[in-house]
Amino acid sequence: MKGSISYQIYKGALLLSALLNSVSAQQVGTLTAETHPALTWSKCTAGXCSQVSGSVVIDANWPXVHSTSGSTNCYTGNTWDATLCPDDVTCAANCAVDGARRQHLRVTTSGNSLRINFVTTASQKNIGSRLYLLENDTTYQKFNLLNQEFTFDVDVSNLPCGLNGALYFVDMDADGGMAKYPTNKAGAKYGTGYCDSQCPRDLKFINGQANVDGWTPSKNDVNSGIGNHGSCCAEMDIWEANSISNAVTPHPCDTPSQTMCTGQRCGGTYSTDRYGGTCDPDGCDFNPYRMGVTNFYGPGETIDTKSPFTVVTQFLTNDGTSTGTLSEIKRFYVQGGKVIGNPQSTIVGVSGNSITDSWCNAQKSAFGDTNEFSKHGGMAGMGAGLADGMVLVMSLWDDHASDMLWLDSTYPTNATSTTPGAKRGTCDISRRPNTVESTYPNAYVIYSNIKTGPLNSTFTGGTTSSSSTTTTTSKSTSTSSSSKTTTTVTTTTTSSGSSGTGARDWAQCGGNGWTGPTTCVSPYTCTKQNDWYSQCL
């Protein structure tokens, strides 16, 4: 389940792109230039990874919104200026968004690493942030993940209860919606076009217009509110986590790409009818603690959150190709040079350690949850979003809708200790966002070493009884683009400690057209996943 995405900023909101006349449009301001911090990532093949030079942009809900004729705020606290913004159309013409002041948000990058700080105070106070990976200054990077894997390193050691360092994909437009909605002149350069499976209604602008009509300020969030419109699209939550709990969760939608909804028909966190929309707001989540494995993840546990680790997510298809139907989502971890598989569920009636349609149906039945996942297309529905190509989101937030209890505590709060699926972590149910903000202002998350490529191409590691050595050589290659540099990194890994010959643990060992090894090093067994893919497990 995914909670509210009500990210906070204490004095500001959205401005959008410039037109030179008074027609309705999202305007671009001129008070602060928009610049994008550099962030590298890697594309991998079976034997090498190519480093790609990208950058990140902060979501357009963060920068201050002011009048096009001066510096008067269009949005202060959680309220629109009634003169500048009497309605959606007029507000879009009167107001503009400038570049984000990253020194105020204290979002920092270094090489392939991104750090997001929780509470920051400069000229104004900011809570959390949401960023997108860019291909170039005006286009989001799109990822096609079917029959691929996605890997990144994360440090959650400074994320306590009540916080969510979320890394995920959404099916938003690569240009931020500029082509579809000509009144949006800001686009991806300024972080516009966000959508997710909650169909968020707290966005200040959607589809080139303001979200003023029907705006109701939040009662418990001094920076946010809810408008008449929401922005929907398929969402693949690779990682929602703090140092106590984590979850991987696909959320399909009837229409995978970005669409605008109205009022209660949006469903999700922001509507009285949670299941009244066209997306699955709950998703099908694999949280190890919720699945009965309470000693797998956390400080000092199998995955020790006191230290950084690698997260690997694989997207298998029914025919082993990038054009097939999504059939399974697998999860691995690497920590201390050791590959660690996702734990097996211990819930009665729910077996396995990966997400499939049958696993999701069994989990929904065991927990008594509404099966919106199946209703909105299940794995095939999620795969349709992945086939579109999705934008990478990296964020840190707290939850003014349900206090993040759905991730790391007991939810619903009136559940008993024997209620199936209610226990999601060890955190207390009594905390509130304002307490989290005042108690842990220095919390932060670090994402780094992002890689994508064919299955088993982005990570290496042994087991407790094996050791490995890695030799890496690099060379730079020129490109025709002045904005992008590609570096080829060739990695050779030699392992010892496992007896016999064959494919290493977790590697491919069979499938239609497979020409590599068909046996596994001891003690692993070549296990068939489908006709096109077998793996050493």
Swiss-Prot record:
Residues bearing attached sugar chains per UniProt: N136, N414, N456
Taken from the record, one Pfam family name reads CBM_1
Q: Which range is the signal sequence, renumbered to this chain? A: 1-18
Residues of the active site are E235 (nucleophile), E240 (proton donor)
Q: Which CDD domains match?
A: GH7_CBH_EG
Instruction: Name the source's superkingdom.
Output: Eukaryota
**Record keywords: Hydrolase included?**
yes
Family statement drawn from the similarity comment of this UniProt entry: Belongs to the glycosyl hydrolase 7 (cellulase C) family.
Q: What is this protein called?
A: Exoglucanase 1
Provide the organism lineage as a comma list.
Eukaryota, Fungi, Dikarya, Ascomycota, Pezizomycotina
